[in-house]
Amino acid sequence: MASMKQQQTPASSAVTAAAAASSSATAAVAACEGERKAAAINSELWHACAGPLVSLPPVGSLVVYFPQGHSEQVAASMQKDVDAHVPSYPNLPSKLICLLHGVNLHADPDTDEVYAQMTLQPVNTYGKEALQISELALKQARPQMEFFCKTLTASDTSTHGGFSVPRRAAEKIFPPLDFSMQPPAQELQARDIHDNVWTFRHIYRGQPKRHLLTTGWSLFVSGKRLFAGDSVIVVRDEKHQLLLGIRRANRQPTNISSSVLSSDSMHIGVLAAAAHAAANSSPFTIFYNPRASPTEFVIPFAKYQKALYSNQISLGMRFRMMFETEELGTRRYMGTITGISDLDPVRWKNSQWRNLQVGWDESAAGERRNRVSIWEIEPVAAPFFLCPQPFFGVKRPRQLDDESEMENLFKRAMPWLGEEVCIKDTQNQNSTAPGLSLVQWMNMNRQQSSSLANTAAQSEYLQALGNPAMQNLAADELARQLYVQNNLLQQNCIQFNSPKLPQQMQTMNDLSKAAIPLNQLGAIINPQDQKQDAVNHQRQQNSIQVIPLSQAQSNLVQAQVIVQNQMQQQKPSPTQNPQRINGQRLLLSHQQKDQNLQLQQQLLLQQKQQLQQQQQQQQQNQQQLNKSLGQLVNLASQQSKLFDEELQLQILQKLQQQSLMSQSTSTLSQPPLIQEQQKLITDMQKQLSNSHSLAQQQMMPQQEIKPSLQATPLLPTVQQEQQQKLLQKQVSLADVSGVAFQPISSTNVIPKTGGAMIISGATQSVVTEEMPSCSTSPSTANGNHFTQSTKNRHCINTERLPPSTAPMLIPTSIDAVTATPLMTKELPKPNNNVKQSVVNSKLPNVAPGPQNCINHALQTDNLETSSSATSLCPSRTDGLVHQGFPSSNFNQHQMFKDALPDVEMEGVDPSNSGLFGINNDNLLGFPIETEDLLINALDSVKYQNHISTDVENNYPMQKDALQEISTSMVSQSFGQSDMAFNSIDSAINDGAFLNKNSWPAAPLLQRMRTFTKVYKRGAVGRSIDIGRYSGYEELKHALARMFGIEGQLEDRQRIGWKLVYKDHEDDILLLGDDPWEEFVNCVRCIRILSPQEVQQMSLDGDLGSNVLPNQACSSSDGVNGWRPRCDQNPGNPSIGPYDQFE
């Protein structure tokens, strides 16, 4: 009976509006004003009684009114559906866009049930202000209220009892009690929705103690006729005043009197008022009862637009929907869209009111409708246990003038529409493509279904043009809808670099099905690309630009303007017949197809021109490369000739030395012979110097060649062959003569196999004071220092030679030295476990700098270090590199390429000849290359612990000589002449030798894990070998036994323990979907989710940041797979479990 009284006033005004809408609206407004004068309704209390999901649109905004939903409210209030004899109104559309003129809040005087009275006026056009008000209504959230709600029990409604208030609610809402009193008590005053004051006594007593409302409560229960099951709401407003509200339990209505209007008459009144207002654009009044109505039927225009054009609905789409729970709580339930059809295809055809058929995940969660409207749901594209949070980038700040009003409206209404999503590029793991909205990202895999949906939606609007009641509104609305859809599609094309541009243009403009995706243009235009080698083909594919972004945008805008202009030109008038309208639609469709085909041809032509230009550019580059290679080959052949001439000159010098030594007694008797030999030597030197100058002139133009051409592997191969020939000749000459000689060599390389090296007992230490040095500190020892070894009697101690004849010095480390027949006794066991080291020689008459160091770019495997403090710049007094080498080829940074500082010997100053008794005047040139196997096998720690012992065991030289050698080497390499160093004692100075180097320590090689980490909340992480198991069931059984949850992972309950894992592509998936072999190959770590975590994710739709605040670390490395470290930001809830999944 109470519900009937509540609906009597709306029904009466609706029937009157059918006869005269304007007069009924005026009377209703007058009646509401009179009622409002009697009792003002508190807005906070009204909304609290209405429910947490009810939000009334603001006055002056645009709304969408659905008569079908209004009729459902009448049926729900009367507990009776619409009868078949209720007439239909064909001129009444399924929805009306109206301007909200007024909203009045009311409450039933008998039941205290709340309802609202709204005055609406249909509009065909609307201004900017109304649209802005609708937009702002979505942004402005309703302020949080301090309240509590309790469902009354039988003891609460008894006349001799009191109202038991929950402890936390009493402490939060009520004023604090004075606990010094016994018992603590106070008097409270509260106002109901009709502004009536009620007085209660609040006392804290009982066993156990509890908060009670005693005196005055029985009067309130009897006055409001409350029963068990009803709910009482207590609100504390801004002025700290208490407000009382009532929510009645849903009960069957009592028998309705025959004098009351029947439900059929009420249906007729509602529909008649709406039809009259739509036909005359006149105001009409409706009543909205949030407690009786299944759902809102007056929707804010911005909310409707956002839901309709931002969500592309398809069958099988997952969604979540908010529902009200007990005591004014809310909860989201997950569901699936199972169908899209009209709720009432006879009366309301093509209506969007509850046209989605849905199925719910939890069948026993309460009574929920099997049909919903699109603006009531939130579509989701990922399963409930996935969280897309790591893929979000930082929001780019936008200005108000950057985008259109409608786009800003959507993004402000739903903030996650403006979030940007980073999509990983499958070709390049380091590159991302930000700037994609979440809606577009969710709908990437549904392009075909969205195309069909858009085509059907556009055809629906085209068909609506024939409706006389919608002629003025449909054209305006159609242009706006096309504009919004085109903008969304345009963003898709631009963000994906337009690889699917024709397909999306077909969706937007109904193109022909013969459109060719642009990612196939390369194979159509130039099929010969497949015959090229893989490198050039890949380079061409990467360099192809499908279409510039600005050009793609301009093409889409052009097509959009054309469609809108044609729609406006072809807008039918009310006097046109249906046949002419159909003919215009057909003509418009053909024109669109012709224009789109022309756009496709222009795109194909542009792609062909760009491809031809790229091919021409590549041919020019190839020609230039071939020309440069030819010049380098010629240069290599000329240098080989110089090597032969140098060898001849060395032989002559050797002969001269032998003749001087063997015929020292007969020098005065044979002067003509000596003069003849000297003349021959002088001629050879002149010829050699001329050849050097010619080679230098030919090599100067090669400095302009790109660095990529200098690394051509052809030249090192030719030079290595020539160097090996030269080395063989020199070794054979040394063996024959038996006397160490000094060659003048233009090469600065030492063979990898290790040639014959002449070892001398004499050492030479030279100071370079003419030029700045790159060493850490300048040398202080001046003059020449010699140490004579008694064992090397066949070696000659030579004085410093003039710059024209001084040799080029390249000292080597221990492993580069291989013993000659002369050194068999000295070095019987060469150690091959020590990596080679190189120190650059010094050039004469050249300015210091990184370009003056020796370049090893001709080697296939070089050594490199950055800014080594032990590398020295050239000096005049240290020796001569042959004049045929230009200074531009000497690059310090390329010299130490691929070096590992912590596993190799320190470089030695070229001015120091005391490297294990090696005389720099008797050194030959050998190519130095990096031993790859040695680098991988050497361990830095082992090397540091045993270097001195290995040197002592493998190279048993004299102690005095070694001490002198070591001291000189350290002083010259590190600039510390007073450093104590003794290589004989392996227990000291190893750390000083290795740790005081100027090269930075190389990072330790990261070990590859062969076991998979498993995490579970509240437990220490474990590591398992996935390869041990044969399938998912065995793995689940092992994990359950490992973490003590046996029998809980194998059951099939809907909400229980879940296993998820992260694969090699950083995607989080549910365990058990992929084949077992693929899972074993791609799994990186596994996560066990508890039922509470699964339930929390089903509520929120994702794995929030506060689900796992305290995750235990793994026992192996102390790193959490779901968080960077356990002790990092322990109190920051924003550090979610998915921030770093590694």
From Swiss-Prot:
Any Pfam family hit: B3
Cystines in this chain: none
Cell compartments where the protein resides: Nucleus
Region (Disordered): 1114-1142
Gene Ontology terms: cellular component: nucleus
InterPro entries in alphabetical order: ARF_dom (IPR010525), ARF_plant (IPR044835), AUX/IAA_dom (IPR033389), B3_DNA-bd (IPR003340), DNA-bd_pseudobarrel_sf (IPR015300), PB1-like (IPR053793)
PROSITE patterns associated with the record: B3, PB1
Entry keyword DNA-binding: yes
Gene Ontology MF annotations: DNA binding
Record-annotated PB1 domain positions: 1009-1093
Gene3D superfamilies on file: 2.30.30.1040, DNA-binding pseudobarrel domain (2.40.330.10), Phosphatidylinositol 3-kinase Catalytic Subunit, Chain A, domain 1 (3.10.20.90)
Induction (free text): Down-regulated by auxin under light condition.
Keywords, ordered alphabetically: Auxin signaling pathway, DNA-binding, Nucleus, Transcription, Transcription regulation
Entries under CDD domains matching the protein: B3_DNA (cd10017)
Subunit note: Homodimers and heterodimers.
Similarity-based family: Belongs to the ARF family.
Domain comment, as recorded: Interactions between auxin response factors (ARFs) and Aux/IAA proteins occur through their C-terminal dimerization domains III and IV.
Protein name as annotated: Auxin response factor 5
Record organism: Oryza sativa subsp. japonica (Rice)
Record gene name: ARF5
